Design a protein with these regions (language model features):
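Sec-dependent N-terminal signal peptides
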Residues: 4-13
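N-terminal beta-rich core of secreted/periplasmic extracellular enzymes
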Residues: 20-187
Length: 187
């Protein structure tokens, strides 16, 4: 009887060990990682760390430690190997803080022309070059997500964010937006 018990333990031990292993991002298929996420984790991944809850107040303050001045981070899920991703604002170039507490150097980003001015050139090659330069800065400063370009059209001249949009013409907006995204994604 003892032999059968020992044999059973050794046969099923690997299954017990592997049953507790969680899929890790980058090592397991993405579908498995998503299946292992709780509904709360999925919601937090989509909403980021701007939400106020007791257990994530620490994560909200981490953005400035990663990239000072960045717009925010996504909620990290360490048990599945999902890191916090840094989001940076940038319809006219990457916007982050120029100063770091830990470094005496100043970190300037390029201030590119606003979207309406870029679109007025009708030059998709130029816009793609601007996008590539933005993408380079995003990469160099350690940001993961650029919250740009803004893909909207000018519907009302009183809209306070029209400077972020390319044009009132949907055709021009589409052509320029494609060029910008291609440029950013070259990195």
């Amino acid at each position: 009887m003892i032999k059968y018990c020992i044999f059973s333990i050794f046969c099923f031990l690997p299954f017990l060990i592997w049953a507790d292993e969680l899929p890790q991002l980058g090592k397991a298929p993405l579908e498995k990682v998503i299946q292992a996420m709780t509904v709360d984790e999925k919601i937090r991944l989509l909403t980021g760390t701007g939400e106020v809850a007791e257990d994530i107040l620490v994560a909200v303050g981490e953005t400035d430690k990663i990239v000072p001045g960045a717009a925010g981070t996504t909620y990290p899920i360490p048990r599945l190997g999902i890191p916090a991703m840094v989001m940076a604002d940038g319809p006219a170039g990457l916007r982050i803080s120029a100063r770091r507490d830990s470094c005496p150097r100043t970190f300037y980003c390029t201030a590119f022309p606003v979207a309406t001015l870029l679109a007025s050139t009708w030059n998709t090659d130029l816009v793609q070059q601007v996008g590539q330069a933005m993408g380079n800065e995003v990469l160099e400063y350690g940001c993961d997500i650029l919250l740009a370009p803004a893909l909207n059209i000018h519907r009302n001249p009183l809209c306070g964010r029209n400077f972020e949009y390319y044009s009132e013409d949907p055709f021009l907006t589409g052509k320029i937006a494609v060029a910008m995204v291609k440029g950013i994604q070259q990195n």
